[in-house]
UniProtKB/Swiss-Prot annotation:
Keyword Chaperone (UniProt): no
Family the UniProt entry places it in: Belongs to the class I-like SAM-binding methyltransferase superfamily. TrmB family.
Listed GO biological process terms: RNA (guanine-N7)-methylation; tRNA methylation
UniProt KW keywords: Methyltransferase, S-adenosyl-L-methionine, Transferase, tRNA processing
Transmembrane segments: none
This enzyme's EC code(s): 2.1.1.33
Binding positions for substrate per the UniProt entry: 112, 144, 177-180
Binding site for S-adenosyl-L-methionine: 33, 58, 85
Protein name: tRNA (guanine-N(7)-)-methyltransferase
Pfam families: Methyltransf_4
């Protein structure tokens, strides 16, 4: 299941949420950092607290490379990394009441209105935190944007699930990030908020339970012309959507698909279509490794329906 010594591929695990005691080989407190950057902060935390286990989320490949070099240098055994949007990962990979602390250090503030759902002040993300944090577990949020700090403060203070223990300007911490040191050296203001969970929340997960393999077996007269007609076609159903971006032919057929699930979680993957004598199998291509979300599974059902529909455009 471990792709490198530190990187996990949760999409290949048999059940969701994950059993972190099995992954680390022990039962220990779990600490999460969202957006670990070059890994400096996470590495130092893991080094200072060998009794705890640490999980970092990032989407940058460069960050993964830099972070793992640091972990290897310290010979750390208590840290794992996941390359996925943390809004999805925190909700889907951790059971309720399983995380002791979440660090969010100097995230992008997403100032534009159309991006506000990406902020930690969004309702969905707050619900996730209220579910996965253990009782009295904390969120530690640091930023150099005062308006963002005030917005986060207001969000936690108005929540029934949290109380704010700390709101501090120009704070000092034992472990600092690169940006923290940079802003302080430039005399720029920094802000720290620590919110503590006081009430259990609930969250709707997309992938709870067994992580089953996805494929479709069907019969019909599938032609290259029918497949090409799928290109650019958008399929919508309630809280999920997908589009067939491109169809390729090289022996079998290959379909490039982009899907979006409830909450805005987007994936790009390839489906392999192979068949003989009117019998077909549509499955994930071996080169694709997405999460088996409702939108992905629906694309595997809906595409055969479209290809075999009588009189379909």
């Amino acid at each position: 299941m471990v792709v490198t010594e530190y990187e996990l591929k949760p999409q290949n695990f048999p059940r969701f949420p994950l059993d972190w005691s099995e992954i680390f080989g022990r039962k220990a407190k779990i600490v999460v950092e969202i957006g670990f950057g070059n890994g400096e902060f996470l590495a130092e935390l893991a080094r200072r607290h060998p009794e705890k286990d640490f999980v970092g989320f990032e989407v940058s490949i460069t960050s993964f490379v830099k972070a793992q070099k640091k972990f290897k240098r310290y010979n750390l055994k208590n840290v794992r990394l996941v390359k996925v949007d943390a809004r999805f990962g925190l909700r889907e990979l951790f059971p309720d009441n399983s995380v002791e602390k979440v660090y969010i250090n100097f995230p992008c503030p997403w100032p534009k209105k159309r991006h506000e759902s990406r902020r930690i002040t969004s309702y969905d993300f707050l619900q996730t935190l209220s579910a996965v944090l253990e009782m009295d577990g904390t969120v530690e949020f640091a930023t150099d944007e005062e308006w963002y700090a005030r917005e986060v403060l207001d969000t936690f203070e108005s929540s029934e699930y949290f109380v704010v223990d700390v709101f501090e300007e120009n704070f000092k911490r034992d472990v600092e990030t690169r940006y923290e040191r940079k802003w302080k050296s430039q005399g720029k203001k920094t802000f720290l908020i620590v919110a503590r969970k006081v009430k259990n929340g609930t969250v709707k997960r997309l992938m709870e339970g067994e992580n089953t393999m996805a494929h479709s077996v069907f019969e019909g007269n599938v032609t290259w012309e029918k497949l090409k007609e799928l290109e650019g076609k958008v399929f919508k159903d309630k809280n999920k959507i997908f589009v067939v971006k491109k169809v390729y032919r090289d022996g079998d057929y290959l379909l490039k698909v982009i899907s979006t699930d409830e909450g805005g979680f987007q994936q790009v993957y390839y489906l392999n279509l192979s068949g003989r004598d009117g019998k077909w199998v549509l499955k994930l291509d071996e080169g694709s490794d997405p999460y088996r979300t409702p939108a992905l599974k629906w694309s595997l059902r809906r595409i055969p329906e479209e290809l075999t529909a009588q009189g379909s455009p």
